[in-house]
C-alpha cells in the first residue's frame, strides 16, 4: 500500500529489525526507519542489527520509550509495578534508559546529529484520549487489549515517568 502512494520508492522491506543481517540486500540503505516497534527490544540489539545495513552517513529514525529524570527517585516497589505494567505491553523495563544514556549509546554506535523529540502527548495521551472518545466499547479479545493499552498509555502519560520519543541520528563516515 505504501508503494502505491509513493511509487518513486524503489523498494520497501518489511522484516524483523533484529535479523537484518540475514537478509541479502544488494546495497546498504541511506535511511532506516523503525516505526512504533524498537522499544519492544534491547536498544543495543536493535542498533547492532541496523548498523549492518545502513550506509556511512546514513540516517536512522525510530521510536523508543525512555525513562524520565524523575525515575531514579522511585522506590524499588514503584519500579517493580512499572516493570509488570510494561511487561504486559511486551516491553522490558530493563531495556529502557534515560535520554542521556540513550544518546551515549547511539554515540557508541558511531551516530551523531542525534535528535530526541518527546511525542508522549501526541502518542500516549492521544491514543488513550481517542479510545476513551469512542462511542461504545467493542466486544472481543482485541477490544480488551486495545482498552488495556489505552489505560497503560494514559498512566504513562499522566505519571510522566516513561516517555514516548522519536529519535533521529546520522551515521558517521568511517
Task: Annotate each language-model stretch with its function.
Residues 115-174:
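Conserved Class I S-adenosyl-L-methionine
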Residues 30-44:
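A short SAM/SAH-binding and catalytic strip from SAM-dependent methyltransferases
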Residues 100-119:
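A SAM-dependent methyltransferase catalytic signature shared across enzymes that methylate proteins
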Residues 21-32:
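A short acidic, Gly/Pro-enriched loop at the edge of an enzyme's catalytic core
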Residues 59-86:
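Conserved class I S-adenosyl-L-methionine
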Residues 44-59:
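A short glycine-rich, Lys/Arg-flanked "PGG" loop and its adjoining helix->strand segment in the class I
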Residues 85-101:
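Acceptor-substrate binding/catalytic loop of class I
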Residues 5-19:
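Conserved SAM-binding strand-loop segment of SAM-dependent methyltransferases
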